[in-house]
A protein has these predicted regions:
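Structured soluble/peripheral alpha/beta segments that form catalytic or ligand/cofactor-binding pockets
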Residues: 1-312
Length: 312
């Protein structure tokens, strides 16, 4: 559901739909959202992962509507739910229209003691940024008309997540892929500078969805970072808990620029690619490999004061 009912600025909320067709030669991210404040407005961002270009479409805040009891958002003539999107954009930047439907959604499991990917941190009030995963992997049906090109996404695969709060973090690394050799396998991982009281800590959340089981590693689960190296061309990251060890190597690639929220406006310029790859190895600490593979067409963001992120 939308979290901004009756809230005052600073506040933003955005949803991220990753869309890849069956032929894997069309890759898009569509990001609807809203930011409240003096320069408040609704928006829809569109990232073309093949071309490495993006467009940012602005709507008056009063053209944003959200249901109070479920996730359904409308921005102008555009509709967004977990099961489908309907887009109708025609301005000086781009023309985009069509309907996509999503089947076989795989939401991050929600339990009374762990309400989603953030665990008990989801109950902490006034955190800078909250995160949620609506579907780790699903199939797509339908098509989009993008300018003069008709793109059939039927039998493609998608992913949906969301962010909300006051601002994006000072620094973070995020990557995601659900295009492994074994269909349905997905990884989503992020590490960021998290303000806490008068200080900050390095918080992380990782989920590996494989063969119908979710392996989670997070600050709140007691997992720890063994290695985190950010290079010009890659991110090397190793985490472990009492049972498992997870090795990840994300290869960076060219992408496009998205706008991200500050406490005042959509002022962060965030480089994101849909052309990265991520090598994953999950094993039991006692011995025995559970999964090894390379995720294609990974979304990847590496942003902000990385020296501070690494130093925490």
């Amino acid at each position: 559901m939308y979290h901004g009912h009756d809230l005052k600025p600073p506040f933003f909320e955005g949803w991220y739909y990753k869309l890849i067709n069956q032929a894997e030669d069309q890759r898009y991210a569509i990001i609807p959202g809203i930011i409240l404040g003096e320069r408040g407005h609704a928006f829809i961002q569109v990232l073309d992962g093949i071309q490495g270009t993006s467009t940012y479409h602005v709507f008056p805040a009063d053209q944003f509507w959200a249901a109070g009891d479920r996730f359904e958002v409308r921005i102008g003539a555009n509709t967004f739910t977990p099961e489908r999107i309907v887009v109708q954009i025609d301005d000086e930047q781009a023309r985009l229209s069509g309907e996509l439907r999503f089947d076989g959604l795989s939401p991050w499991p929600v339990r009374w003691h762990s309400p989603g990917i953030m665990g008990w941190y989801a109950w902490v009030p006034r955190m800078e940024c909250y995160h949620g995963v609506l579907s780790l992997d699903h199939t797509i049906a339908g098509s989009l008309q993008v300018n003069d090109q008709s793109i059939d996404f039927s039998a493609g695969r998608g992913y949906i997540e969301k962010d909300w709060g006051q601002s994006f973090p000072e620094a973070w690394v995020w990557f995601q892929s659900n295009h492994f050799q074994s269909p349905g396998t997905c990884i989503t991982a992020s590490v960021a500078v998290i303000p806490w009281l008068n200080s900050a800590f390095r918080g992380f959340i990782i989920g590996v969805w494989h063969q119908g089981r979710l392996y989670r590693f997070a600050t709140y689960t007691g997992a720890r970072i063994e290695e985190l190296l950010i290079r010009d061309d890659s991110v090397h990251w190793v985490v472990s808990d009492r049972q498992y060890r997870l090795e990840m190597e994300a290869t960076r690639a060219q992408g496009g620029l998205l706008l991200g929220p500050t406490r005042v406006e959509m002022g962060k310029r965030v480089a994101e690619t849909l052309n990265a790859s991520v090598q994953v190895r999950l094993a039991r600490r006692a011995g025995g490999e559970l999964f090894q593979g390379t995720g294609r067409f990974s979304g990847l963001e590496v942003h902000g004061a990385l020296e501070r992120l690494l130093a925490l």
